[in-house]
Regions:
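Structured secondary-structure scaffolds
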Residues: 2-43, 48-49, 101-105, 124, ...
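Short cysteine-rich clusters marking metal-coordination/redox-active sites
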Residues: 129-132, 149-153
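Short, charge-patterned binding micro-sites
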Residues: 51-57
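Feature captures the FAD/FMN-dependent oxidoreductase FAD-binding
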Residues: 98-118, 128
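Acidic, turn-prone loop/beta-hairpin segments
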Residues: 52, 372-395
């Protein structure tokens, strides 16, 4: 018997400073659907998800809520894992970035990049968004009437100055462009690839990869005064889930990752920083990064201030799990933004599930009850036409 071909698929790992919403649920459900289809196609599928638990934003949220950061991480990571289970997502591993196995992976990748000569220590000064956990060039910012700058995401930024390790991202500009040219499928959909290529062609700057103003993170090897920038730590979770350092046989089987499913807002980290880091560490690159769109509510962006953030558990309870999974995968063009509303949900459920599929099932069962004594007919001999259909299905 021939061994099944492997297929490794991941969600991004959501940031554990808040509760999950329908945007997180959408990514979990669509990734699970893709994993199931690959399994039906005969692949040995590894589906990994998890939670990103480090960073300054976690510390600030824990302080506001009167909790320890460890408590916040444990509670919210469990909330994301519980949601994935409630959505009937058949994930194989849930990676928490506070786990010892992940710390070892992140530090090994750092050592390899450092050994390559791609990490150096220097004074950093620039604009930083705590909420985005991202640095921005001033030309990317918008200036408000009061003189304050805001990031492209609409979040406030503050001027940061501290000693920091830097990664030589600028050294990988040509290699990244060559990657996109040779493997245009690396970034999807096509509109996202164009965005990524345009960004890289405008010139890449080395980026800060450590912090000294707090200690909630993975310590930098050889210098405990620094912790890794949260994205350097978080991105390596995909290696952790594949068994890097902990299970050589598993890693050889499933790496490189076949498909990273992520939100379009974190495409830069996955399509630029991540492959550059892997090139530096001499680790094979993933095959594809796909950036899906956002889920809006009544065509408006979800916002706590507006009060339109939807708890996925409420939708499961109100409509049912199968209906919820069907709605989001049928209603939203994959790769583009979509919108949820009660009216759209009810209309889609009634039109497709109750009327079309429901009527088909009802009529089929009625015919079986009437003509086959209520039992499924047993297939005795296949015709040549039947054999042709079976062959076509097996070769698909």
């Amino acid at each position: 018997m021939t061994e099944k071909k492997s297929f490794y698929i991941t969600t991004s790992i959501p940031y554990a400073n808040g509760a999950p919403h329908i945007g997180h649920a959408y990514e979990m459900m669509t990734t699970d659907a893709l994993a199931r289809f690959k399994a039906l196609d005969g692949y040995d599928v590894l589906y990994v998800t998890g939670a990103d638990e480090h960073g300054q934003k976690m510390l600030q949220t824990a302080e506001k809520q009167g909790k320890t950061v460890e408590q916040l991480a444990a509670e919210n990571s469990k909330a994301f894992e519980d949601l994935s289970i409630a959505l009937n997502c058949r994930f194989d591993d849930f990676v928490r970035t506070t786990e010892p196995r992940h710390k070892a992976v992140a530090q090994e990748v750092w050592r390899r990049m450092e050994a390559k000569g791609d990490i150096y220590l220097e004074k950093y000064s620039g604009w930083y968004s705590i909420r985005d956990e991202a640095y921005y060039d001033e030309k990317e910012l918008s200036k408000q009437e009061d003189g304050a700058f805001i990031a492209p995401s609409g979040t406030p930024v503050e001027w940061m100055e501290e000693d920091s390790y830097f990664f030589k991202l600028s050294a990988y500009e040509d290699k990244l462009l060559a990657l996109y040219s040779k493997h245009p499928e690396f970034v999807g959909p096509n509109t996202r690839r164009n965005e990524v290529e345009s960004f890289v062609k405008n010139g890449l700057r080395d980026f800060s990869i450590s912090r000294t103003t707090f200690n909630w993170g993975v310590p930098v090897p050889g210098n405990d005064a620094h912790v890794m920038y949260v994205w350097v730590d978080a991105l390596t979770n995909y290696l952790t889930g594949a068994g890097f350092l902990s299970d050589d046989e598993k890693f050889e089987k499933y790496w490189p990752c076949d498909l990273h499913i992520i939100g379009k807002d974190i495409l830069r980290f996955h399509a630029i920083y991540w492959p550059a880091m892997l090139m530096s560490a001499d680790i094979e690159l993933p095959k594809r990064v796909f950036g899906h769109g956002f889920i809006n509510v009544d065509n408006e962006k979800m916002s706590k201030s507006v009060g339109n953030v939807i708890d996925p558990h409420d939708l499961i309870e109100k409509y049912g799990l199968d209906q919820m999974r069907y709605f989001f995968m049928r209603e939203v063009p994959y790769g583009k933004d979509g919108s949820y509303s009660h009216k759209a949900f009810v209309n889609r459920t009634n039109a497709d599930l109750a009327n079309d599929l429901g009527n088909l099932a009802s009529r089929s069962l009625s015919m079986i009850a009437k003509n086959c004594d209520g039992k499924l007919p047993k297939i005795e001999n296949l015709t040549s036409e039947d054999d042709a259909l079976v062959d076509l299905a097996e070769s698909a």
